[in-house]
Structure formats: structure tokens, C-alpha cells
Amino acid sequence: MVDTKKEQEREELHRAIWAIADDLRGAVDGWDFKSYVLGTMFYRYISENIASYINQGEIDAGNPDFRYEDMPDAEAEQAREGLVQEKGFFILPSELFCNVRAKAASDENLNETLETVFRHIEESAKGSSSEGQFAGLFDDYDVNSNKLGATVAKRNEKLVKLLNGVADMNLGDVKEHDIDAFGDAYEYLMTMYASNAGKSGGEFFTPADVSELLTRLGTVGKKEINKVYDPACGSGSLLLKAEKVLGRDAVRNGFFGQEINITTYNLCRINMFLHDVEFDKFDIACEDTLTNPQHWDDEPFELIVSNPPYSIKWAGDENPLLINDPRFAPAGVLAPKSKADLAFIMHSLAWLASNGTAAIVCFPGIMYRGSAEQKIRKYLVDNNFIDCIIQLPSNLFFGTSIATCIMVLKKGKTDNKVLFIDASSECVKVTNNNKLTPENINKIVDTFAQRAEEAHFSHLAEYSEVQENDYNLSVSTYVEAKDTREKIDIVKLNAEIAQIVARENELRAAIDQIVAEIEG
């Protein structure tokens, strides 16, 4: 049953924060301005997070009136080392969001103040185990950018509005609010920015309904997993869905990912913090996954979910080292230079645990194209790694209307069959896009879990059948589309035609008689 109070609270919050965010940008494009709004939200969150943590510790120690926000910086310094070990970062009381905001309107050097505060937050983690999680986190928050204004005074005026606007967002108390307010607000804003940005937005954000489907497919029969990985993690929302589906603490060893775009990489790390993921429970790297993969030495991943970029160019056979790379070598051939899709599949397979599942959104062309891509499909099928192929509806993603597919990979299959599901009609139309409803998702996941066959919806293909079809993995090859044409009863139709002809003859005879009478 849906918690009405929680839903109302969420909708009210969403309306309010989008109004604030939209107002704040002024004449600046929302997509360009997102780093300021989201970065300010993060600054507020970690300020309130560390203050709440310290205050609670003092209350528990019998000091109920203590407020870290009012503490002199010199005294607070004594706790720096311990707090960095426990929280991963440190903020002086004078540099907390609430205190900087209180003086912002009268601070003629607000841009410099914020630049210093952000540098201090990043530097506080240097030399500690959390250094990688904080390094460069505020790089996209350029306080001297012309996007904020042509002069320092104009820029500071915009920064004051930013601080006040984010302060006005009803995000409640870090501990007491009914919903995961900061993380919720952050994801909502990213959804709005992505939908308004079109194609560029779709490159960093996977819609929540698709994220839910991928994660549920990857966790069928599991109550917990060791960790989750996304080789093209974007803003990280798909990674975080594992905890929402399985429950808090069900992802034992955390969240791992790689992202090539530095702005999106920073958004992803911020997203982790805003969802209260501890600094030692996530590891996001900013590198090219295909040519410079991270997490080589990590324990393999029990869950891999991803929506990698469709048919992008990559080094391929131009790089002589890649054909001997242990990720790609088993297939004996590399994905084409102009289409990296199957390179992401092979990479994911290499990183997958023996008891794990990978659910990856794919461009449909990789299911049927020939040459190198056919050879890679042959390798995947012959070695029994492909568990299921799902045809999705068109228009599910921001910035593209193509109908994508999901490929589900497993290393520990109990049969050598491939399940094909035609879910192309499992959606509802919402404004300009299609959306998967909970009912749509349940139907797909239930069919997948039971490996059930249903006419015009799913087919469990034998290995030999896939072989006979030259390793074509298009769902339409295996699941016959429902014939929606009206069935015609020929006997009934002929009788109706005979009646019409007879009636026509009667009318014609009557008309002839009338004409004869008039002429006579």
C-alpha cells in the first residue's frame, strides 16, 4: 500500500525545489546551471550531516545544549583528525552552510569565501582513506564563471540567491525527515534537468522505471549481494537502485562504477553522499572503462547493471593490446571500432561473479548484425552466458526514441536455453515518453524468474534453435508478434454481399418502374 503522507510530502517537495531551481537559473540554461544547484545542495547536506553527527555525540554524552554550529573554530580543530577518520571529511563551524549563508548577503567576497570553503572540504580528506571520494568534487562549481554574472558583484548576487534558495528547500532534519529528502530531491532535479536537456541528459541518467527493472532482473532470488557495479555509471542512480530494491545494508560491500565524463563523475560521487552512503562503501573512478578499466583487483561483482552509451566509437583493433586483453580475448575478436556496445558486454562479463547476474541495456543492432558482432554473440551463446534477451518499448529514455533491449548475462546457468521476452507493448504513454508501470515491470520480472513461455510474449529457445538462426538474438526472431488484424468470416461476408446485391437489384427495379411511369 502506498504511504499517502509520504507521497504528498514528496510531491510537495519536488514542486517546491524545481520552482526554486528554475527561478535560480534565470537566463542560464538549466543544463549548464545544474552543477551549481546540485553542488549547493551537497554543501548544505554535508554541513548538516557533520553538525548533526557531532551534536548527537554530545547529547549522548550528557551535553544536550551543545551546538557545533556555534563552536569556535580553534576548539573544533581539535576534533579534525578523529572526524576525518569517522566521516571522511571535516568542516570548521564558521565554514558550515548555515553560517556562510547567514553572512552571504553582506560578504563582498562571497565568491572567494565559497572557493576557500570548498577547497578546505576537499583538502580535509587528503592523506586519508577518503581522499579519492572528495578530490575535485567541487571542480564544476566555478564561482568566477560568467554564467553567474558579468561582474563579481553580479556573480555574488547570484551566489546569495543560490544559498538562500537551497536553504529554503524543505529538506527537513537530516535524522528526522520522513523521506530520504536530500537524495530524493537530488534525483528529482537530475530527472528534470535530463528530461529538459534531451539527448545530453539521456547520456548521464537512466529513468527510474528502467533502473528498477534492471535491478530487479539482476537480484531475482536474492536478499543481499556482495556489491554492485556499473561500467558506465553516469550520475549513479542506477547503482543506488540496488539498495532501494533489496533494502538498506543489503549491498554488503558497496557501490562501484566508472564514468568517463568528469562532470558526471562528480555528480555521481555527490549522489552517493546524498544517499547517505559512507565514504568507504563506494568507489567511483573517472577513466575510460574500455581502455583503462579500474577495479581489476576487486572481488568479482554479484550484480552488474548498466545503460552504456549506444554504438560509440572506441579504440578497437587500432590498439594492438586489446585483442590480448583478458576481457576481450576469449571471443577471439573485438567489437567494431564504430560500435563499442559488445565491448561493454564483454567487459561486464569479465567483472561478473560466478554466482552473479548482469542486466545491460543494449542498442538493438548488436542482436543481429554480422561480422565481428556475430562472432561475439556466438562466443556468448556457445559458452552459455546469455540468460535472457528482453525487447523494451520505444521512447523510454531521454533524448532517444529507439526501442532498446536488455541482455541478461549469467555465469552459473542451470540450463543451456535462452529466454526471449517481447515487452515492446509493456508501457503507458506519459507526455512525450513511454513509461514502465509497476504492473509492466512485475510481468517482465515474473516471466524472467519463472522462465515461462507465453504466446506472443515469451519463448524459451533451445541452444540448437539459436544456432540454427545463425546466432541472431533479435526477440522478433523467436517471439511471434500478435496478429491484431480483424479476422474475417468469408462465408458470412459472402452472404452479406449477396444480400446487398439482391437489395440493390430490388431498388434498381423500383427505380426503373418509377421512370417508366413518369415517361408513360
Question: PLM ranges: what are they?
Answer:
Residues M1-L213, L217-G218, K222, D280-N292, ...:
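Non-catalytic, mostly N-terminal accessory regions of nucleic-acid modification and defense proteins
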Residues V2-T4, Q8, D298-G520:
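A conserved structural/catalytic subdomain of Rossmann-like adenosyl-cofactor enzymes
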